[in-house]
Amino acid sequence: MTADKIYRYMLTVPSGLEEVALDELREVAVHLDRVNVEPGGRFGQIFFTYRRSPLQLLDLHSASHLAGLICEMHRVTVGQPGLKSICERVERIDLAAVQSLARAQPGEVDTGAFALSVTLQGRYRFSNAEVRHAVREILREKHGLREGSGSRLLRFHLQITGHRALLVLRLGEGNTGSSAVAYCLCRLLAMQRDARVLWARRDSDELSAIDELFRPRLLLGLLPEQRHGAKVQIGVVAIRGQLPLKAGLIDYVLGFAAGDPISELAELARILRFGGVAIMQVEHFDRYIGLMEEMDFPFVVLAVLGLQEQGRKYRLLILERLGEIDPELLQVGWDV
């Protein structure tokens, strides 16, 4: 950091998909330094130094939020002295550097107004409301800012996790969690435009993101039966198990293993074209892999990733549909 400049940034990305997000980041911003990936429970975070215009970073599809790192505090204690140390550090922030970073965004930003959000992850003897009240008062009284609303102002976020606190300035509009997840999954599949895609997961908001970002020729969404009646604005939507598909029709499948795995794998083998790729979110991984080996379905496992969602651990299994027998590859119902 030099005078009146912030060069340290933080990306908030889907948990378990941090490396996918980092791959997109390196593609967009080639001059990165001091990259640090911190996996998390619901979200992961990527910290990095970038000395060029942040405008290039605002269009990242894999991130829920992009923020400039204003200050980082360590050894934060759980009692009132910890809150006091946070407040003392906020008093010393370089407001000119914060305002300069905010003005680097496109459009007009009111750098005299602010909004503040706070998250606490851990057990403390001070509340979220106490932190917000104390920090807001400092921003008003010490730094001369006024409170406002909307997105065209200084959007401060204070994150307190364990014994560390981060004060950041959020930049850009960000993406919904659904959109970021959908992009990362499609990037893992190396999805091409004008493809035929089957989506059979749980968050139907992912469908709109896939349609907007990848423009498939066919986007078919199969909702779990408990989601019957859900409002979906894009693609063809049906209830899983009620819409037959032509064999070999689909190029890519994004699925959540929720039913009988043998039936699901058999249907996956039937509808995927030779060379087609599927990404399946699986909770009982060992059982799933065991059935693939036992039943000898025509798939090869390309990759396995860990994923945490709503407090539960899953694996993302990337499968390619084989077109011929290869004894060197793991295969999953294939008769010759």
Give the role of each language-model region:
Residues 2-148:
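Non-catalytic nucleic-acid substrate-recognition regions in nucleic-acid-modifying enzymes
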Residues 47-50, 306-336:
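Core SAM-dependent methyltransferase catalytic element
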Residues 177-196:
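Conserved alpha-helix/loop element of class I SAM-dependent methyltransferases that forms part
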Residues 193-205, 209, 220:
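Conserved class I S-adenosyl-L-methionine
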Residues 224-243:
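S-adenosyl-L-methionine
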Residues 240-254:
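A short acidic, Gly/Pro-enriched loop at the edge of an enzyme's catalytic core
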Residues 262-274:
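A short glycine-rich, Lys/Arg-flanked "PGG" loop and its adjoining helix->strand segment in the class I
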Residues 275-283:
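Conserved beta-strand signature within the Rossmann-like core of class I S-adenosyl-L-methionine
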